[in-house]
Regions:
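Outer-membrane beta-barrel "beta-signal"
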Residues: 332-345
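Outer-membrane beta-barrel translocator domains and adjoining extracellular loop/strand segments
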Residues: 21-27, 61-68, 102-107, 143-146, ...
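Outer membrane beta-barrel
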Residues: 1-165, 173-180, 184-191, 271-278, ...
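Flexible, glycine-rich linker and terminal segments associated
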Residues: 285, 316, 342-345
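A short, acidic, flexible beta-alpha connecting loop/helix-capping segment that sits on the rim
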Residues: 322-328
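Well-ordered beta-strand positions
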Residues: 41, 235, 308-310
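Detector for outer-membrane/organellar transmembrane beta-barrel domains
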Residues: 1-11, 176, 184-296, 301
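C-terminal closing repeat unit and adjoining cap/tail of repeat-based domains
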Residues: 306-321
């Protein structure tokens, strides 16, 4: 038993923030915990790597609750070839194909959710199965140490899977299964590994029953609205600079809430840009992001700017940022806040 415990690793990830601002015309100020993860990983052998992550969050009444974020068995084929490296399968409550990839390029999930999640399309985990692998051999250690050791395939990486479709916030409300896939390529391979081009596809239905009725049962409309997304991202990572540009177009969303009066899925489209200027000589970064998203002709623009300081390694960060949301025909909302990310190990 003691020998097995030596193969268990424990990690934490916390986002602790305090800020003030204006939301829908009303002033606010608060201190809050936006993420509280406790993760246990078990690696008894290289080919079997199960994981469980508990997520502590605060509900609308202010009560603190613990829920599962991930709980899966992961099977890895520990090989490195000229074609694929470390193909693996996650089964259970698993990573989706996209967000773990994007959040290892834009390292500021502590500020808030990523582009398509921020606009209500999808969240980051679901119950199902994910297949993933690196394309080609791994990039040289020098690149991994100076730029990034995440998804280090010489020619990119792929991930795809089939999921219940409710995410990790909700039970499955229909029998539909959702297909999601990501393809990321380094078009110049190891010649210019900094550049990646990625494509995300989502094909399924929103997480509602086949028929949705009001409380009286008299007014009903068809459920299971279409949920489609096509998104592309170009990214460039360097020791001193990171930039991404995204475009997306689709219909509907994961929860099935983005619909018209007849229950049909709303169309959507948007674009986003992110940049980080790294200042390693003072363990700091300047970050900026711009989002535009449009649901059926109603758009929202968002601007984010911040300064980050890293201490005791790359995982512990203090971020001071300003976030402003500007909806068409509505009242701007904004927040200035300080966030501390604590990551162990």
């Amino acid at each position: 038993m003691q020998k097995l415990w030596g193969k268990v690793s424990i990690g934490t990830l916390w986002y602790l923030s305090g800020g003030f601002g204006k939301s829908n015309g009303a002033d606010f100020s608060n201190v809050r915990i936006t993420r509280g993860y406790l993760t246990l990983k078990f690696k008894p052998v290289p080919w079997f790597q199960p994981r469980v992550t508990l997520d502590t969050s605060q509900d609308s009444s202010g009560d603190w609750k613990v829920r599962l974020k991930y709980m899966h068995a992961k099977f890895v084929l520990p090989v490195e070839t000229a074609w694929v490296t470390e193909p693996n399968v996650e089964f259970g409550l698993v990573h989706g194909p996209w967000f773990d990839y994007e959040e290892n390029i834009n390292r500021y999930r502590m500020q808030g959710t990523m582009f398509v999640e921020r606009n209500g399309v999808i969240n980051s985990a679901d119950t199902g199965v994910t297949v993933a692998m690196l394309l080609g051999k791994k990039l040289p250690k020098a690149y991994q140490q100076s730029v990034s050791n995440e998804y280090p395939g010489e020619f990119g990486s792929i991930a795809f899977g089939v999921y219940n479709g409710g995410g990790y916030h909700a039970a499955e409300n229909n029998t539909n299964k959702v297909f999601e896939s990501r393809v990321s390529v380094r078009p110049l391979g190891p010649i210019l590994p900094n550049l990646q081009l990625s494509y995300l596809l989502i094909y399924g239905k929103g997480n509602t029953p086949a028929q949705v009725c009001d409380d009286t049962g008299a007014n009903c409309y068809p459920g299971e609205p279409a949920w489609r997304l096509n998104a592309g991202m170009a990214s460039f990572e360097d020791e001193y600079f990171v930039a991404t540009a995204q475009v997306a177009k689709g219909r509907g969303n994961q929860s099935g809430s983005k619909i018209d009066a007849a229950g049909a899925a709303l169309t959507s489209e948007g674009y986003s840009g992110f940049a980080e200027v790294r200042l390693p000589w003072i363990d700091s970064s300047l970050v900026g992001r711009y989002d535009h998203w449009n649901w059926a002709g109603t758009g929202t623009d968002r601007v984010i700017a911040g300064f980050a300081y890293r201490f005791l390694g790359e995982g512990n960060v203090v971020l001071l940022d300003y976030d402003r949301s500007m909806p068409d025909g509505g009242t701007d909302s904004w927040e200035a806040k300080l966030t501390v990310q604590v990551k162990v190990p």
